[in-house]
A protein has these predicted regions:
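Charge-dense, extended regions
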Residues: 213-275
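Extended, charge-enriched helical/coil interaction regions that scaffold DNA-processing
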Residues: 85-102, 265, 269
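DNA major-groove recognition helix of helix-turn-helix/homeodomain DNA-binding modules
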Residues: 67-88
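Helix-turn-helix/homeodomain-like alpha-helical modules used for DNA recognition
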Residues: 92-177
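Recognition helix of helix-turn-helix/homeodomain-like DNA-binding domains
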Residues: 36-72
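A short, Lys/Arg-rich alpha-helix, primarily the initiator
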Residues: 1-44
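Amphipathic alpha-helical repeat scaffolds of TPR domains
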Residues: 143-155, 166-178, 190-231
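Charged, low-complexity interaction regions
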Residues: 157-164, 181-188, 208-209, 238-240
Length: 275
């Protein structure tokens, strides 16, 4: 199972990386991206017909891992185009054993603002699950904040701190909802969510119950949240441009409108006895 999940993670990273690159170059077809990044791989046969090379098609689907040389070439043409492929979130998700020895290394690979939230005054990883820490990471919803929350959830699980694990799981769920439409633009939303169902949400237990997201429509919920956030934004009038982009969505998840929309964005739970 771990091997299959590892392949899924690599596939997702490669596919998303290729999509980022094609967006930057404003090229949709894999062959057009190939023409810009690796023109030397385009050749013709004796009849002057182009030789079909399916590697870039494979990259776009996450089927092949590009070489480091090719990734560096892409990085020179489109800066930060390969950051998704090498993002620490994939390492955090695929690591099967204890992670406490590697946690600091992974934190140091995250955005500096996220590091400032996760690290305490003596450059130690924060303990507990304060609303200050969770809220700061949720407001900055990104691949980096999601990686940080996932790492912290796993650390607390290793320490047997199940109440804190539950709080982090709830926070991860909210960030996934905030990022859902972004993931969907890259065609990886459902795959990303299912990886979290398998690898992260399964860690949580709450008052004799466990998370059951087997029938949860993640993509629909994410777009529904966007629609709600827009309606909330319109109510705020002149204040709207002063807020962080996630402010209005979080009003529906944890703020003023939480109770009104709770049934749409509450984590489904089932009794452990039913498992």
């Amino acid at each position: 199972m771990v091997g299959i999940i590892h392949l899924k993670l690599v596939s997702m990273g490669i596919g998303t990386d290729h999509r980022c690159l094609s967006n930057h170059l404003e090229k949709d077809a894999p062959r057009e991206v190939q023409r810009v990044i690796a023109p030397n791989t385009l050749s013709s046969d004796v009849n002057a017909d182009p030789i079909k090379n399916n590697k870039f098609l494979g990259y776009s689907r996450g089927a092949h891992v590009p070489s480091k040389a090719l990734a560096l070439r892409a990085e020179r043409v489109a800066p930060r185009s390969s950051w998704v492929l090498y993002h620490p979130i994939w390492t955090v998700l695929r690591s099967a054993g204890p992670i406490h020895k590697h946690a600091m290394t992974w934190v140091r690979q995250l955005d500096h603002e996220i590091q400032g939230i996760v690290l305490g005054p003596y450059s130690t990883i924060v303990g507990g699950a304060s609303r200050h820490t969770l809220g700061a990471l949720e407001r900055r919803a990104s691949l980096d904040s999601l990686a940080a929350l996932t790492l912290l959830a796993r650390l607390h699980h290793e320490a047997g701190e199940h109440e804190w694990v539950w709080l982090y799981i709830c926070s991860i769920f909210r960030v996934l909802l905030l990022l859902g439409t972004h993931f969907d633009q890259y065609g990886v939303a459902e795959r990303m969510f299912q990886l979290y169902v398998q690898r992260v949400f399964s860690l949580a237990e709450f008052e004799g119950r466990r998370v059951d997201l087997s029938n949860y429509d993640y993509v629909f919920a994410s777009y529904h949240l966007v629609g709600i956030a827009e309606r909330v934004r319109n109510k705020h009038g002149s204040q709207r441009d002063r807020r962080m982009p996630t402010f209005y969505a979080l009003q529906a998840l944890t703020g003023l409108y939480e109770q009104r929309f709770k049934k749409h964005f509450q984590i489904p739970l089932v009794s452990l006895a039913e498992s």
